């Protein structure tokens, strides 16, 4: 079984590394547009195989999509970071063009693949890939909620001094400031988190989660890569091994939660077919209001893409 990661930067290379270490696929292809870059990263990862004791083959390719043919899953991390002076619309146009080009070539060589988008702005780039791929929406989805939830759980584990393994949580909505936390659905070994932590402290952890990506940027001067790469690999594993895992995923909504024609983070079941079910939670009025506010923010950005010539539906 083959899995491809497009984009050999920090996130893509980390994803490939995790896939290899956990032997999630027999063959892992790392592809990048920069000459020799993916080959170098792939070789470096492969040279850890005798140390980490895995058999997954890791190879690199410079923009040769024929090497990706027959991939069960393709992770797309390609895109440029927002630079000083660059408007939001400029960033959307640039990265949508990149995602469109990549998606076209991915589908040409792997028409039955599932596509996991990691490129930012996440929700709208997933939409761009869906418009380009012209396949069922259950096969094109985005990684955001797995990362955001991992951050939330890790912060709670620090505050409560418990194992992060015992914390279960769900976040919904867009990736970023408009994400929707659901403390009612956050538990520690089945115990509601609201019984273990004061509301003020919980709210502070939620705010830290919303700004989690920015916190890393402020410390490093660049975006995170370990957690995003591992989060993408976890989604790939759920698909490849048909695990039926329940993950918050950027999915195409067609009436669920009263929302239509929008990519938004919601709980889903991930298995060999991609998104096998969108799970509708019973939200209270406050949670619904936050979700609709988040949806409106995402819809605004999607409309920016709709008004561009970058991608035609």
Language model feature labels by segment:
Residues 8-9:
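Glycine-rich Rossmann-fold phosphate-binding loop(s) that bind the pyrophosphate
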Residues 87-153:
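Rossmann-like NAD(P)(H) cofactor-binding subdomain of soluble oxidoreductases
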Residues 51-113:
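Rossmann-like NAD(P)-binding element
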Residues 33-71, 300-306:
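Conserved N-terminal Rossmann-fold NAD(P) cofactor-binding segment
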Residues 133-139, 148-313:
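C-terminal substrate-binding/catalytic lobe of Rossmann-fold NAD(P)-dependent dehydrogenases
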Residues 12-13:
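N-terminal Rossmann-fold NAD(P) dinucleotide-binding loop
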Residues 1-3:
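Extreme N-terminal starter segment of soluble prokaryotic enzymes
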